[in-house]
Amino acid sequence: MADVLKTVWWDEVPCLIDQRLLPATLDIVRCEDLNSVIEAIRSMQVRGAPAIGITAAYGMALAAQRSTAQTSSKLLEKLAKAKALLDATRPTAINLAWATQRMLDVAQANHTLEVDQLRQRLLAEAEAIRDQDEAMCRAIGQHGKVLLAQSRNVLTHCNAGGLATAAYGTALAPIRAVHEDGQPIHVWVDETRPFLQGARLTAWELQQAGIDLTLITDNMAAYFMQQGQVDCIIVGSDRIAANGDVANKIGTYGLAVLAKAHNIPLYVAAPTSTIDLQTADGAAIPIEQRSTQEVTHIGQQAIAAAGIKVAHPAFDVTPAHLVTAIITEQGIAYPPFAEQLQTMVEAANAANAGK
């Protein structure tokens, strides 16, 4: 099994790779307090729905460690406030709120513990969230590689690799699994404007893993589909609604429409923690609006005239009818998705409750 880079971990405090600096610089950030965790998520030092969920869980554990509360009840009050602050950083990715709620639930369920014992219990839960995420990613890889068995040219968008998770990735997991089995596979990597996660992160990850790749600009994808050089598309997700509508990085919907026009399957890979059964469909998913400077600049270099009007929705929603299959750690769901997604979430919850 190939080694994969760890994205976020605990070493007395939450530690993470500053993904804004990749691939030029591999820099480790140590978050010494809750505010630094919040800033790391908001500024996209850490990004990717599962990874920010793990980071938020560590943020809750850190808030407990740093709190001067002398009783468990006071600590619970501090944790509720920490959850609210963390949840507000990135509204589209449901894994964040899922992780902070899980941490709060554990705190409430263990409120009879002495306060120091409760702090340790919370850290153990955050570590469990991290470890379970990596295990889920590897399971996604094993399930998903079956769908890629006949695909030699796969297109992916944004970064849903190890950098977006605890390790190994979601959309890149089946690609890694095929490669580890010794089968040939080639990946078309969308650069993913405006933050360039594909160019900076996915291409770098695949290169590190020794997987054949070609970097393309986003507006080249249709050309390669038209030329018959794309066998399938696989992407991650930041939130999947109960009906199977998928929120993912801006540009995913456009790829889905193109895939439908060219009869190319579109696969979505995500852990069950990304499935939001409380959100009926994509229309109810909040779409984060990010900084205009991320559009007008690349790094510190301006590429547009000063003072122009800019729109920057960070995500779009792909309707369920454009999705061929959803790959989770519990298996593969096919349309219609609603009943299967509910069953998968229930199975995952039952498995977690038994640990």
From Swiss-Prot:
This is Methylthioribose-1-phosphate isomerase. The gene is mtnA. Belongs to the eIF-2B alpha/beta/delta subunits family. MtnA subfamily. It catalyses: 5-(methylsulfanyl)-alpha-D-ribose 1-phosphate = 5-(methylsulfanyl)-D-ribulose 1-phosphate. SUPFAM superfamilies: NagB/RpiA/CoA transferase-like. Its EC number is 5.3.1.23. Keywords: Amino-acid biosynthesis, Isomerase, Methionine biosynthesis. GO terms for molecular function: S-methyl-5-thioribose-1-phosphate isomerase activity. The keyword Lyase does not apply. Signal peptide: none annotated. The record marks 158 as: Transition state stabilizer. It is an enzyme of class 5 (isomerase). InterPro entries: IF-2B-related, IF-M1Pi, IF_2B-like_C, Initiation_fac_2B_a/b/d, M1Pi_N, NagB/RpiA_transferase-like. It comes from the Bacteria. The active site is at residue 238. The keyword Isomerase applies. HAMAP family: Salvage_MtnA. Substrate binds at residues 47-49, 90, 197, 248-249. The lineage of its organism: Bacteria, Bacillati, Chloroflexota, Chloroflexia, Herpetosiphonales. It comes from Herpetosiphon aurantiacus (strain ATCC 23779 / DSM 785 / 114-95). GO terms for biological process: L-methionine salvage from methylthioadenosine. Catalyzes the interconversion of methylthioribose-1-phosphate (MTR-1-P) into methylthioribulose-1-phosphate (MTRu-1-P).
